[in-house]
């Protein structure tokens, strides 16, 4: 099967733009082969939707995959591996600005962060971006069995591809119609109806679509991880030294990009109420906020607020901001953790819950997160009331005060995580792809 993927965030991020790469190497053939570059010039995605899709490609028997993603000033085409080619879409500054405002408006409404007053020019930029993606995807029409489009940034792509080819869409963020304005809710629903099949990550999202009057085919699948990809565990002592983690520290780990939606502030307020515990916040900015991405300062502003909060609560010596960590360092942090948190008020799923379980760690998860559907209180972890740092602190104490039960919960969690292993979910996804191929 030949699959063409579309997502905003690419599977690879460069530390130099295309002109910088040309200046460094002189001549680069297009497509640019990653194996010909120094490893310091790029990094493969270590989180989110791109990481999930990379693991899917590794574990599936796809004959060939083409992936279209946003890549400002990136090389036009990059060869990641023999069966994976990435094609980058670039936009002018004005279009990027309008696009960011519109898609962040959707994001904020979906997560209950803020209402968005739609501005026609911002929508136009969003539509242009989706059109450019669809144009690139349609170049592969005769050599594609199914298009696989991912997330809210690409809502219009299915309607543009239209009846020319089968298109499957996975919507990864929350869909709670009651917290969205009618215009945004209806825009999302009508856009989804242009796809042959829509996949959502949780039962709650599927129920939300039904309440909103969605007329189409929708399926629920839990996002997936490859447990083998989490087997890279770096030098634990080196990681402890790097992040000033002592042998007697109880490590409370929260893995996620620096984003107000992740509510790291709730974790900081909770840790102030838990003695002899060190909160490790692992992650940097999203593609939108990172250098080499869209370079907004959302992550930087949030970091400064979090650091100020830690100082005000006198816990700055017990809160560690790691910034970007490699897969090996992340594995070491999971190994060191006594408990892993997911604190978002609202989140589509939260794969870090399953990652923690792969390492047989107990979790404490906000009830507003999709992965809370898999948490059985007192059995594989605990849930807490969103934004209630007192409740979170009590649940963390329950884990730390009963080490034998914590070990048992981690073991049960590992069994739960098998429901989200790529080997099982990829079979379901392949069946969906095959079901829409009639259009070819």
What function would you assign to each model-found segment?
Residues 246-262, 268-271, 280-282:
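Conserved donor-binding/catalytic core segment of Leloir-type glycosyltransferases
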Residues 292-325:
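Nucleotide-activated donor-binding/catalytic signature segment of Leloir-type glycosyltransferases, i.e.
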Residues 353, 362-365:
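Short hydrophobic beta-strand element within catalytic cores of glycosyltransferases
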